[in-house]
From Swiss-Prot:
Keyword Cytoplasm applies: yes
Name assigned to this protein: RNA chaperone ProQ
Domain of life (superkingdom): Bacteria
Organism: Shewanella piezotolerans (strain WP3 / JCM 13877)
Gene Ontology cellular component annotations, sorted alphabetically: cytosol
Length: 212
């Protein structure tokens, strides 16, 4: 019996999704916002496919929906689509605002990294020995006018939630990886809390992973 090799690389899984669901996952160009709860549909469609696991699918879907290309397509008046490319309703303004804020933050971080990298590269050249020049007499410059001090914005500190403080339809943040992800509580069963993320994913986590 021929065994099927399981895909583990996220890029390979995305390529597989592009090929399997071309009307939903767009490989190049402008993408379209995905249906809320699409992960469940995806898991059901690929339940008998031994190439991919639910965990790897979730990671690949998160990569797809957090890319700049995807976030740029989340704008007012746009409709979400299902696995077959069918329209599933217009985007809510709250989701549009969150996507644009996430995009802006991601682009600013990337810009800061580029500047920091450029600074490290130019530092050795700046420290190189320069020829000594004779001092040139200069006219005294007028004292520069004081620049207005920018007011620092207080950083929002998120703290772990207590299960008894949580309720349905409450806006929360879920600790996933390095940065918390915003979402809405759909249901609470015992110690498990079901949260619908703004990207469309629906996950189930313990209260300790929810931040307020």
């Amino acid at each position: 019996m021929e065994s099927t090799e399981k895909l583990t690389d996220t890029n390979a899984i995305l390529a597989y999704l592009y090929e399997t669901f071309p009307l939903c996952f767009i490989a190049e160009g402008e993408t379209k916002p995905l249906k809320i709860g699409l992960f469940q549909d995806l898991a059901e469609r690929l339940a008998d496919d031994s190439k991919v696991s639910k965990t790897q699918l979730r990671i690949a879907l998160r990569r797809y929906t957090s890319s700049w290309r995807y976030l740029k397509c989340v704008k007012a008046g746009t409709h979400r689509i299902d696995l077959d490319g069918n329209s599933c309703g217009e985007l809510e303004q709250e989701h549009v605002d969150h996507a644009q804020a996430t995009l802006k933050e991601s682009q600013e971080k990337a810009k800061a990294k580029r500047i920091a990298k450029a600074g490290k590269t130019s530092a050795p050249a700046a420290n190189a020995k320069k020829p000594v020049k004779k001092p040139v007499a200069r006219r005294p410059k007028a004292a520069p006018s004081a620049k207005p001090v920018k007011e620092k914005v207080a950083e929002v500190v998120l703290t772990p939630a207590v299960l008894t403080e949580l309720k349905k339809n409450q806006r929360v943040n879920v600790k996933l990886g390095k940065a918390p992800v915003a979402g809405v509580i759909l249901d609470i069963k015992k110690e498990d809390v079901q949260v619908q993320l703004d990207s469309g994913l629906t996950i189930k986590v313990k209260a300790e992973y929810i931040l307020l």
